[in-house]
Regions:
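N-terminal periplasmic accessory domains that precede
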Residues: 102-106, 116, 120, 146-151, ...
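Face-selective signature of the C-terminal outer-membrane beta-barrel domain
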Residues: 303-331, 353-493, 499-502, 509, ...
Length: 772
């Protein structure tokens, strides 16, 4: 797609979606939320407007000085409901509202949980960069945990995989989960009780402090000061040996909370299949064709994660959190067996087995303090150690001899320390954030392959950032800047790189139900430990790979134009995206004497153009809702000696039905396709059906993944001229029936604890899961 066509597409969609229809009602309700004791503004309180029959009409949050407002109201009776954590909820009856009214609401401080606000109809507040979703009574009663509740909301741009309990973004960016503003894991979200959740704040524009994250999902939960909860969240297969289970317990006493979470996942099958077809063209010779026909293989996996947490909260001004975590991932078998043909002639068999084990203890300390004049500071320090062990055994053999064999082993020890601090200041119509972050890591690797080779790498990354957010009337904008330094050093390299990384957002509220937003961001991607490991590994007789110590960090530029419009039961939104990488790290394949070497290099450029539309309908009669998404991708990959492009259309669909205590879920998710370097990767492609029964503190259900046909697989196609290949991986685990059970027991009064506003973790262990 050339530049003129791209600009034309942007303009057509921009003018097609602009809608300036706004109603002209003159009545309004506005005012301030104030602390009854201090008379100071209460920031970010939740305000909902109901009819007297409890039907939800509108909702908003107070700004940084406690202001709120509702416009375009007809003459009627209303109920104004105000709630904020740390205060008692208050409801005000507005009888016979026939003209605009100014209402100041005074809230009393309280250590008790908030009174329930029953929402019985549509309850989403759409802002330029955020959706605030108040869960309805129906959604709460049909959800067993925080993850299921999110699935009932069908938020645009989010893909929820109920099998893996993972959340991904349709634009490929990272999704950050939070509880009361703190980064959380999917397992922690699973432990949330629906009755705790007051609202979900979904931001599809993430500020510069969140790095490369594209979406933020923040659960706002209630707090008490005593009691506890214990519970389980189980999902296990009925036809294969596989499952994922969560066990949790929390105990609250005074200003302290103690929490213990244990998560385990496991899978064991003997139908791990891989089919690979490739050719090798050396010089001007006739290509050698090799076909590997899959013949099963063992796959086994275990994951154990134990987390002990303690936090202390003094009112809303001081919060301390300490977390001790130990994670073990054990992958003893990822084996493939194949029958081998060369130029159509059977030559033997292949065994390709990979094992991997990772141990990671972590300590995480966090401190937050609120200051006078709408100021707040945060500090976070994380220390971790990761020991990773990887082994590979590759053999080609016939009935009499071993034709080719290669053994490889790697032991990696990584020590890392992450420290971050943020200062925040609120103003009348905006806020300012200043922050600094430093990452220090040291890695030692020992490689066993025809001898023992040792290497080490020191890596540091330091950055400072500033961000200004402003909103007034119908216009909002955000300006941010990050200055970044990355340094690599070992016995053979000593390099530093500096980058200036801006981020901007401009949005305009076209009407009460529609808005348009544009944002642009420049970010940096660093080479991974695997890419920097300068050791050659033979994959088969004709193929090898190695890292590259001369790799440099590269920059990304993201542009996004977004439009949304709501009317009744219908919500429509559209995205135009462009993602550009300058000198990205992509693969190169070079001919050696008798084999080809795969090696990462900084290439010329990479582009992705994307157009996507989503239509959500519901709830219809408080029973049915569904959403449809369709889109188009175009990729262009420019290497130093190659040029490739790839295009694809895609779609997805979700349906949800709720009746009495029963819930039905249906999902269709097609292949996620991507061209990067010379390789097209297609992964995913599943459909899911489930039925669930919900009762107080208890639910069970039956679900089926790919019940009609096993369509899930991973397809990788390489387009290199001299050594192209096509690989397809699949197993019986992609077609399974699962049983789910959720149970929890509460005693006293429980609360979602005070929470952190920043969280850091180092997950680059310098190992790979497969090698061919």
């Amino acid at each position: 797609m050339d530049l003129n066509k791209k600009h034309l597409l942007y303009l057509i969609v921009f003018f097609l979606f602009i809608n300036l229809n706004a109603s002209g009602q003159s009545n309004s309700v506005s005012g301030k939320i104030l602390n009854q004791s201090t008379k100071e503004p209460v920031r970010y309180a939740s305000i909902a407007l109901f009819k007297q029959d409890s039907v939800f009409l509108k909702g908003t949050t107070a700004d940084s000085i406690g202001r709120f407002g509702f416009t375009n109201l007809i003459s009627d009776d209303y109920v104004l409901s105000v709630s904020c954590m740390g205060f008692e909820a208050k409801k005000i009856l507005l009888q016979n509202l026939s003209e605009s009214a100014e209402v100041d609401v005074f809230l009393s401080e309280s250590v008790l949980s908030l009174g329930e606000i029953v929402v019985s109809a549509s309850s989403t507040i759409s802002k330029i960069n955020q959706r605030i979703v108040f869960p309805t009574k129906l959604q709460l009663s049909h959800s067993a945990n925080g993850m299921q509740l999110l699935n009932t909301m069908m938020l645009p741009g989010l893909n929820i995989n109920p099998m893996a309990n993972t959340i991904s973004s349709s634009d490929g960016g990272k999704v950050v989960l939070q509880i009361n503003g703190v980064n959380a894991t999917p397992e922690e979200v699973q432990t949330l009780q629906p009755r705790q959740i007051r609202r979900v704040e979904y931001s599809d524009y993430a500020g510069i402090r969140y790095g490369e994250a594209s979406k933020i999902v923040n659960y706002i939960v209630t707090r008490d000061n005593r009691g506890g909860v214990i519970g389980v969240d189980l999902m296990n297969s009925l036809n294969i040996l596989a499952g994922g289970d969560v066990f949790f317990a929390k105990f609250n006493k005074g200003k302290s909370e103690y929490a213990l979470n244990y998560t385990t996942a496991f899978q064991k099958i003997n139908s791990n299949n891989r089919t690979r077809t490739g050719s090798y063209r050396f010089g001007n010779s006739t290509p050698l064709h090799r076909d590997e026909i899959g013949d099963g293989g063992d796959y086994s996996y275990q994951m154990h994660d134990v987390t002990f947490g303690y936090n202390y909260q003094q009112s809303d001004s001081v919060f301390f959190n300490a977390k001790l975590k130990y994670a073990l991932t054990n992958h003893p078998h990822n084996d493939f067996k194949s029958n081998l043909k060369e130029n159509g002639i059977e030559t033997g068999r292949i065994f390709d087995g990979v094992s991997q084990k990772i141990n990671t203890p972590t300590i995480d300390l966090y401190y937050e303090r609120g200051l006078k004049n709408q100021q707040k500071v945060y500090a976070n320090v994380v220390g971790s150690f990761a020991k990773a062990e990887t082994g590979r055994n590759y053999i080609e053999y016939d009935n009499a001899d071993t034709l080719f064999s290669e053994q490889f082993g790697l032991v990696s020890d990584k020590y890392s320390l992450i420290a971050e601090g943020i200062y925040e200041k609120g103003f009348t119509d905006g806020s300012l954030k200043l922050g600094a972050k430093h990452i220090q890591s040291f890695t030692e690797q020992e490689i066993h392959q025809n001898g023992v080779f040792k290497s080490d790498l020191n890596q540091t990354e330091s950055s400072v950032f500033a961000e200004w957010n402003h909103g007034k009337d119908n216009f909002s904008y955000s300006l941010g800047i990050r200055i970044n330094r990355v340094h690599f050093s070992n016995s053979s390299v000593n390099k530093s790189y500096y980058n200036f990384l801006p981020k901007v957002m401009f949005g305009y509220q076209l009407s009460e139900k529609s808005f348009i937003r544009y944002d642009a961001e420049m970010s940096q991607t660093n080479p991974t430990l695997v890419e920097l490991t300068d050791t050659e590994i033979r994959l088969d007789p004709y193929l090898a790979e190695k890292g590259n110590l001369s790799l440099k960090p590269y920059r990304n530029l993201n542009n996004n134009l977004f439009y949304e419009n709501k009317k009744g039961l219908f919500t429509f939104n559209a995205n135009l995206r462009h993602h550009y990488k300058h000198n990205p790290i992509m693969e190169s394949i070079k001919e050696q004497s008798d084999f080809f070497l795969i090696m990462p290099e900084n290439m010329k450029s990479w582009n992705r153009y994307n157009a996507e539309m989503t239509l959500k309908v519901g709830m219809i009669k408080n029973i049915l809702q569904f959403s449809l998404t369709g889109g188009y991708n175009h990729f262009n990959s420019q290497g130093n000696n190659y040029s490739h492009s790839h295009s694809n259309f895609y779609y997805s669909a979700n349906v949800l039905a709720m009746y009495k205590k029963w819930m039905f879920i249906g999902q269709i998710q097609p292949f996620d396709e991507k061209l990067y370097g010379e390789t097209v990767t297609k992964s995913g492609n599943y459909h899911y059906l489930a039925i669930q029964y919900n009762a107080n503190n208890f639910s069970f259900g039956i679900g089926a993944f790919n019940p009609f046909k096993n369509v899930s697989r991973t397809v990788i196609e390489n387009k290199n001229y001299q050594a192209p290949f096509r690989r397809e991986s699949f197993s019986s685990a992609s077609q399974t029936i699962v049983a789910t059970l959720t149970w929890n027991f509460s005693f006293g009064k429980t609360h979602g604890s005070g929470t952190k506003s920043i969280e850091n973790q180092d997950t680059d262990y310098g190992v790979k899961g497969s090698y061919k």
